[in-house]
Amino acid sequence: MPEEALLKLYDEHHRLKLTIDPAAVVYVAADSNYINVHYLENGREKVFPVRNSMKSFEEAARRHGIVRCHRSFYVNPKHIRLLSRGKDGIIYTLFNVDEMGKVPVSKMYYDELARLL
């Protein structure tokens, strides 16, 4: 895979922390001062924490087709099986890999995400 096609994640001091095929990324979650990258490696879920903000991840996400679905989450639409409304009324993503859990989708981002599926 060409170097420019890889997703490169830097920490808050601009040090390279993770280089990954963007197709392997399932979702990214905010956790205090970290972003947790949930990705697949050999069919299994891995999580890699990077000390940085969602705002700083935004440009890299856009370049690689990873979209925001909530103030605390980005998702890769290629891994989404469907969008489902829970009993609590919240819309969630369900992924192709069941072990990945589910991620909330806010009303603000729903239309864009639904259009990509």
List the predicted regions and their residue ranges.
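Basic, polyanion-interacting recognition surfaces, primarily
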Residues: 1-117
